[in-house]
């Protein structure tokens, strides 16, 4: 039989949980923003097959001797290293797999939209090299905005507030793309988690769907769609591309472990043949 007392109790419990989560979000311990350089480990892993002519060139579970490593939300290439961005506003310059005694250099963005030592104030979701060569763009949630930093991430060059009726605190810009010299953004609601400009000028989207069975993900560009052979527990958040000597393209993809020690941060290298 329906009971108003049971309904009231359920609502009270739900309200208490939501209030506790909100309090926890606002009162998390201050983040450690000190720079560090630590060893990074690449453990080869086997993933599923990928449709030809694409080829998996390598896959690794990546870990480092710093508990701030992970939570990847953006990826680029800078000075020969992989440059990853976490959703806590931390930059990670990672030596590539195969490097002798590889390391990762971790440092904080020099300025952020909100309280610098709180996750809510530095919720960075996307990274893009400025098409004009001035530096790097970073997209933020919570305080929805685009920030342009100089090439060395030492200072802020420009801040653009972004307003959209569909945004909520934790759902806003998810992807940045270089659209023939223009900076374009995509919201999380589009399903895109990152984008990369290919050497031939095409824009490739990294898309995903999160359902009851886990995460499914794929790459989409120029009318093509390529399913990614990742585990349903892997959440791909970051994509970048670079040309190969043979005219092909190397794609680098990283997953977000949500900074949970029991989840892996996966790095996947995929080679595409030269475009015809």
Go through the PLM ranges and name each one.
Residues 2-276:
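Sequence/structural signature of beta-propeller domains
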């Amino acid at each position: 039989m329906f009971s108003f007392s049971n309904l009231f109790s359920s609502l009270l419990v739900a309200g208490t949980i939501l209030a506790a989560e909100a309090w926890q979000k606002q009162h998390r311990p201050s983040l450690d923003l000190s720079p560090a350089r630590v060893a990074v480990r690449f453990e080869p892993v086997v993933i599923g097959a990928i449709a030809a002519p694409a080829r998996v060139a390598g896959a690794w579970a990546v870990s480092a001797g710093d508990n701030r490593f992970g939570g990847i939300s953006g990826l680029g290439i800078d000075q020969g290293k992989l440059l990853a961005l976490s959703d806590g506003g931390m930059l990670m310059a990672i030596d590539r797999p195969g490097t002798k005694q590889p390391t990762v250099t971790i440092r904080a963005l020099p300025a952020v939209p909100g309280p610098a030592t709180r996750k809510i104030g530095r919720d960075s979701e996307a990274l893009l090299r400025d098409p004009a060569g001035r530096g790097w763009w970073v997209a933020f949630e919570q305080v929805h905005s685009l920030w342009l930093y100089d090439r060395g991430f030492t200072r802020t060059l420009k801040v653009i507030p972004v307003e959209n009726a569909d945004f909520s605190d934790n759902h806003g810009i998810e992807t940045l793309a270089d659209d023939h010299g223009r900076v374009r953004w995509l919201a999380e609601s589009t399903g895109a988690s990152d984008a990369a400009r290919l050497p031939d000028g095409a824009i490739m989207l990294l898309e995903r769907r999160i359902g009851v069975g886990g995460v499914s993900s794929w790459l989409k560009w120029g009318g093509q769609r390529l399913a990614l052979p990742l585990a349903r527990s892997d959440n791909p958040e970051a994509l970048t591309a670079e040309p190969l000597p043979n005219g092909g393209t190397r794609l680098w993809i990283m997953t977000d472990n949500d900074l949970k020690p029991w989840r892996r941060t996966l790095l996947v290298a995929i080679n595409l043949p030269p475009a015809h």
